[in-house]
Amino acid sequence: MLKAIKIRLYPTKTQQITINKLLGCCRLVYNLCLEHRNKIYEETKESGSLSTSYKYFCELKEMEKYSFLKTDSHSKVIQQTLMNQDVAFKNFFTKKSDFPKFKSKKDKQSCRFPKDAISSIKGNRINIIKSLKDIHFKCSRKDESYLNKNQRLISSATLIKTCSGKYYFSILIDRPNEVRFNKTNNIVGIDLGIKDLIITSNGEKFENKQFYRKQENKLKTLNRKFTKTQNGSNNHQKIRVKIAKLNEKIKNQRLWYIHHIVNQLLNENQVIVMEDLNVSGMMQNHKLSKSIQDVSFCELKQILQYKASWNDKQVVFIDRFYPSSKTCHCCGYKNDSLQLSDREWVCPECGVIHDRDINAAKNILEEGKRIIGLSSPEFKRVGEQAMASSMNLEQNVKY
């Protein structure tokens, strides 16, 4: 299985200059070739091809203005850059993404290396290309040992410079899958929210830490200072890095918390049922959009899915239009008058007092069990045994 090992690089000042030149060349070639393909599209209504971009790059190298591309860039890295651009165009024409955009040196920068570009890894030192040798790096001891012993299994690698000025090297390597979590007979339904990030059908609630909200005032202060500084000045650059570091801190805190929650859910349950939320549609509500961005539902869903697949667990999605909050999990009565502001409601049929979110999680669980009980081909039990019928499932599964 191909997995990425992300290591932190600590290059010297000379190595930083070399890396920055390489990233700058990739960005320049990408932007110039993008401009060239845009002109072709305007004139002929054709997007061009990879060979068109590479031919134009060869012409650029011969110009005196761009003669530095011969010395500061690397041919295989430029090839990968142009291949990425070609993929971006194909995704646009197949309506998978927006039109390719020009790259800025103020954003996160990256360039991709093929597997033969990494010459050797010895201890905590890595040699990438001739101009980038003996770079110090840090990662876990387990990852460092695996990289030293299995360099031949490397598929590709990506050099990354963050907005805060940190350098990383993400190495894609063939690695055996390690199952971290125990197999259980438990199934749980989860409801995603804003006040509480996750509410389970067992009544457990995971708090929304609101990492962005806690740093919002500090970010506003830095942004005000940033707008008052002169563009290109030292103070302008210093404050820009401070803003980038604070945003990076918020992102890392949120990511750590999501991993912590996902690990607990997967360690305790074999099957997890959740709603297939339309996050882009929810973002249209301007009153909730900032809070939805802060909880990062998409990140949570992505991490839960890939960790479940690595650990022989199953994630089941129910229809986004299923009325999980409005339906009484005891008698099935549907309360159409329920508003978003109603956190508790009393069922007029059976008289049960419902916590809105816990009730939704229990309904999600029951709907997930119904879907699994259909034995449709897209829902197979993870593990050695086939998924039992809904009757057997209720006997074997704790909820």
Each predicted region: which residue ranges?
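Short acidic-glycine loop/turn motifs at beta-strand connectors
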Residues: T12, K122, T162-S164, S201-E204, ...
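Positively charged, low-complexity nucleic-acid-binding target-recognition regions
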Residues: L2, K290-S291, V295-Y399
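Stable alpha-helical structural segments in soluble proteins, enriched in small hydrophobic residues
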Residues: C33, T81-F92, I358-E367
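Substrate-contacting helices/loops that form the catalytic groove of nucleic-acid
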Residues: I40-S67, Q151-A157, T162-V188, L192-K301, ...
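Generic recognition of long tandem-repeat/solenoid scaffolds
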Residues: G123-K130, Y167-I171, W345-C347
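Acidic carboxylate diad motif detector
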Residues: S53-C163
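Gly/serine-rich nucleotide phosphate-binding loop at the start of the catalytic core
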Residues: M1-I78
